[in-house]
Amino acid sequence: KNILTLLFVLFGGYSLHAQDTCYGLLRNDTLTIGNNLVERTFLWNGGNIITYRLTDKSNGKSWKNHSLTPDFRVTKDLPQPSNGSLKVVPVKETKIFPAYLKVEVSFSLEKLDIKRVYRIYDDCPAIACDTYLRGTVNSIFGGREVSAADRKNIEFAEDMKSKEVTAVLDQFHFQGQHWHARSVEFSDVTDWHNNLVFEKEIISYRKLGYRGNLLFAFNGEDNCGIFFLKEAPCSSIQLAYQGKDFLTDFGKFTVTGLGITEKDVTPDRWTKTYGCVLGIYGEGELSRLQALRSYQKNIRTYRADRDEMIMMNTWGDRSQDSKVNESFCLKELERAARLGITHFQIDDGWQIGKSPNSVVARGSFKNIWDNKDYWKPDPQKYPRGLHPIVKRGKELGIEIGLWFNPSIQNDFADWQKDAQALISLYREYGIKVFKIDGLTIPSKEAETNLYRLFNKVLEETDEEVIFNLFERSE
């Protein structure tokens, strides 16, 4: 039989390529992707694919999808898809990203081009999907939030058919009436929040929305099920947020909220939405957590000498930036060594520029680059630069890290200057670990520029630099 690898444009054939256990196969009207643990089968539908079946290979359990609509939706209308194509490409491992098989499904809905990129990893019971849009959108994503006071009781059958949120990242519709779920929401900004994880137990029986980045769904008859992981910021700070991330409706589970508006989609470039991961697990809590952890281990290549750390930060004694200087840091390094600290991070105060949190001289995060020396070591505090600190750290087996706050004004328009400042610190002092702080991301353009900053630094440092927060970005 004829098997094409790497690239396939649909005209009634099929494509297969394996990354060890990973595969992508298109035969006639059926697309199948998976590995040795999980398989997801789709109806091709001109490229606007519809999940047909999901299989857990570890226990032989298979679920048929009872929805007849495409997995991804940006409008309530369903125009005929065109230009459907498939690419299957093995992606090599880098210093920070593991190898995976990329299965790229592209199609058009009138003037809108859509690209769904599936990431499949060996020995992982989950498949990730990144979505990109380009062109013109003739609809408004999402709808008006329904007030709780306007909701009717379960006896009102028509109310059970409440309007579905238009924008859908992914969905699966199980058979049966005994489905349960657990949503998990997270909070950031730890200066203000001390309760960081919120879980909600759900008995799915009608269409309701829930907040969170994680949804576990399982059948009450055998406790086996799936999880959806929405790869996005915390719910409270997502872009274009409609108040919910997941919808549950008996056995139907939906991921919603793209993180963009129709105005962010243009004909001249691809715009990425928030990502989504669908994973499967067997019976019990341990199986759920192991499945999730298996995927998380594939987000970044693990290297013990780089990624394991016991970090000490100078901000912790509540003196803010009033104490940090060469003498203080050298003394702290000696104590850190006795405690077994592996990384010593100098927080706000090491630099010439003053932040709004400074007790020495009130500064600002706005117009940082009015002072071209903002991100150089303060000569009053560090007359010899950071060289003595780095040198003593190496002697004690402690790596030095720094605090850094990107220039937030105008959607991170100065990202290139910020990137060069980080690159210069790496080249002069060998600083690899940076705490990125104070981020405010008000728009898709700001998010894009922030990714550009991170990617530029990684490119120029041969992926040696480590940020405390960084998501995969192509």
Describe every region a protein language model picked out.
Residues 285-335, 339-343, 347, 352:
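An acidic-aromatic substrate-binding cleft motif
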Residues 19-294:
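N-terminal accessory beta-strand-rich subdomains and adjacent acidic, glycine-rich linkers
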Residues 345-474:
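Aromatic- and carboxylate-enriched substrate-binding clefts and catalytic-loop regions
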Residues 37, 131, 268, 312, ...:
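Conserved, mostly hydrophobic/aromatic
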Residues 123-124, 335-338, 428:
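Alpha-helix termination/capping residues and helix-transition junctions
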Residues 102-108, 115-118, 123-129, 134, ...:
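Feature activates predominantly on carbohydrate-active enzymes
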Residues 2-14:
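Sec-dependent N-terminal signal peptides
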Residues 109, 122, 133-137, 314-316, ...:
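Short, flexible loop/turn elements at secondary-structure junctions
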